C-alpha cells in the first residue's frame, strides 16, 4: 500500500478509487459513473482495433467493414461490441443526466461538473455521428449529407463551410478521411474531459447523496465498499451487453446501412441513430431551416441554464411533489420526442413534434422556475402558519 501513496501517478489512483470518502447513503443510481468509464474504455480499445483494419475511402470503406466481419479473427465481435456499447454509452448517459436532474446535481457547488458533463454530451453526439458515417452504407452517406447540410443554414458563409467540411461538392474520399481522423482523435479529447469532470466533482464537494444534504461526516472510503457495489452493476451491465452483442447485434441499427452507399438512390426515410432522435425531432418540428438548427443546438446548451432556473429552496426533487410531477412529465415528453424523431414528416407527427418541442423548452424556462417559486411560497406560508 505504501507505493500507492508515494508514486506520483498511483497516488492519484489511490485518491480517487481507494481512499476517497463517499456518503454512506448513496444508492445504485450513483453507479453510472463507473459504468460510463467502462463504456469509454471499451469504445477506445475496440475503436483502435477496428481502425487497424478500416480503409477510409469511398471505394473501400464498406468492403473494409465486411473484411473485418468475415476475415479478421473475432472481427465481428469487435465491431458489434463497438456499435452496441455506443448505444449503451448513450443510454447510461441519459440515465446519469436524469439522476442529476432528479437529485439536483447541477446546483452549487457542483455547477462546474454539470457544465463539463453537458460539454461531454455534445462531444459524444458529434463523435457518434462521425462514427455512423464510417461504414459508408446508405444511411451513412445520406445521414452525413443531411446533417452536414444543416450548416448551410448559416447566412452567407454556410454553403462554403459545408463544402470545406466535405472537401468537395458532395460527400467523397476527403470527407471520409476527415471524419475518420476526427472519430479516432476526439475520444481521447473526451477522455480528457471525463478526467476534468471527475476532478470537478471530487475537488468541490465530492459525490452528492439522495437526501441532498451536505454529507461531510457520515462517510466511508470508496474501497472496498463502493468498489464491490460498482462491480455488481458492472457484471450486470456486461451480461446485458453480451445479450445484445451475441443474440441481437443489429436490433438498434438500421437495415439500410447494410446496403452499400449509392449517391443516386435516396432511402425512403433518413433516420439517425436512436440516441440522436429527440434532438432530430426538435430540428424537424420547426419549418424554418436556420431556426430548426438553432433550436436543435439550443436544446443541448439549455441544460447549462438549469442551475439558474431551479429556484427551489431545497436541493433535488425528492421532497418537492409538484417538481416531481413536472419532472416525470418532462421525461415522458422526452421519450415522445424520441419516438417522433423516427416518424415520417407528416401530420399528425409534425403537430405533436411542435407541441413536444415547446414543452421541452418550457420546462427549463417556465415550468421549473414557476413550480419552484410556487413551492417556495407554500413552504413560507406553512412556516408562518
UniProtKB/Swiss-Prot annotation:
<feature type="transmembrane region" description="Helical">
    <location>
        <begin position="179"/>
        <end position="199"/>
    </location>
</feature>
<feature type="binding site" description="axial binding residue">
    <location>
        <position position="96"/>
    </location>
    <ligand>
        <name>heme b b566</name>
    </ligand>
</feature>
<feature type="transmembrane region" description="Helical">
    <location>
        <begin position="32"/>
        <end position="52"/>
    </location>
</feature>
<dbReference type="InterPro" id="IPR030689">
    <property type="entry name" value="Cytochrome_b"/>
</dbReference>
<dbReference type="InterPro" id="IPR027387">
    <property type="entry name" value="Cytb/b6-like_sf"/>
</dbReference>
<dbReference type="GO" id="GO:0045275">
    <property type="term" value="C:respiratory chain complex III"/>
</dbReference>
<comment type="function">
    <text>Component of the ubiquinol-cytochrome c reductase complex (complex III or cytochrome b-c1 complex) that is part of the mitochondrial respiratory chain. The b-c1 complex mediates electron transfer from ubiquinol to cytochrome c. Contributes to the generation of a proton gradient across the mitochondrial membrane that is then used for ATP synthesis.</text>
</comment>
<dbReference type="InterPro" id="IPR036150">
    <property type="entry name" value="Cyt_b/b6_C_sf"/>
</dbReference>
<dbReference type="InterPro" id="IPR005797">
    <property type="entry name" value="Cyt_b/b6_N"/>
</dbReference>
<keyword id="KW-0249">Electron transport</keyword>
<keyword id="KW-0679">Respiratory chain</keyword>
<dbReference type="GO" id="GO:0005743">
    <property type="term" value="C:mitochondrial inner membrane"/>
</dbReference>
<keyword id="KW-0472">Membrane</keyword>
<feature type="transmembrane region" description="Helical">
    <location>
        <begin position="349"/>
        <end position="369"/>
    </location>
</feature>
<feature type="transmembrane region" description="Helical">
    <location>
        <begin position="322"/>
        <end position="342"/>
    </location>
</feature>
<dbReference type="InterPro" id="IPR048259">
    <property type="entry name" value="Cytochrome_b_N_euk/bac"/>
</dbReference>
<feature type="transmembrane region" description="Helical">
    <location>
        <begin position="290"/>
        <end position="310"/>
    </location>
</feature>
<feature type="transmembrane region" description="Helical">
    <location>
        <begin position="76"/>
        <end position="98"/>
    </location>
</feature>
<dbReference type="InterPro" id="IPR016174">
    <property type="entry name" value="Di-haem_cyt_TM"/>
</dbReference>
<dbReference type="InterPro" id="IPR005798">
    <property type="entry name" value="Cyt_b/b6_C"/>
</dbReference>
<protein>
    <recommendedName>
        <fullName>Cytochrome b</fullName>
    </recommendedName>
</protein>
<feature type="transmembrane region" description="Helical">
    <location>
        <begin position="226"/>
        <end position="246"/>
    </location>
</feature>
<comment type="similarity">
    <text>Belongs to the cytochrome b family.</text>
</comment>
<keyword id="KW-0496">Mitochondrion</keyword>
<keyword id="KW-0830">Ubiquinone</keyword>
<feature type="transmembrane region" description="Helical">
    <location>
        <begin position="113"/>
        <end position="133"/>
    </location>
</feature>
<keyword id="KW-1133">Transmembrane helix</keyword>
<dbReference type="Pfam" id="PF00033">
    <property type="entry name" value="Cytochrome_B"/>
</dbReference>
<dbReference type="Pfam" id="PF00032">
    <property type="entry name" value="Cytochrom_B_C"/>
</dbReference>
<feature type="binding site" description="axial binding residue">
    <location>
        <position position="82"/>
    </location>
    <ligand>
        <name>heme b b562</name>
    </ligand>
</feature>
<dbReference type="GO" id="GO:0006122">
    <property type="term" value="P:mitochondrial electron transport, ubiquinol to cytochrome c"/>
</dbReference>
<keyword id="KW-0479">Metal-binding</keyword>
<keyword id="KW-0999">Mitochondrion inner membrane</keyword>
<keyword id="KW-0408">Iron</keyword>
<keyword id="KW-0349">Heme</keyword>
<keyword id="KW-0813">Transport</keyword>
<dbReference type="GO" id="GO:0046872">
    <property type="term" value="F:metal ion binding"/>
</dbReference>
<dbReference type="GO" id="GO:0008121">
    <property type="term" value="F:ubiquinol-cytochrome-c reductase activity"/>
</dbReference>
<feature type="binding site">
    <location>
        <position position="202"/>
    </location>
    <ligand>
        <name>a ubiquinone</name>
    </ligand>
</feature>
<comment type="subunit">
    <text>Fungal cytochrome b-c1 complex contains 10 subunits; 3 respiratory subunits, 2 core proteins and 5 low-molecular weight proteins. Cytochrome b-c1 complex is a homodimer.</text>
</comment>
<feature type="binding site" description="axial binding residue">
    <location>
        <position position="183"/>
    </location>
    <ligand>
        <name>heme b b562</name>
    </ligand>
</feature>
<keyword id="KW-0812">Transmembrane</keyword>
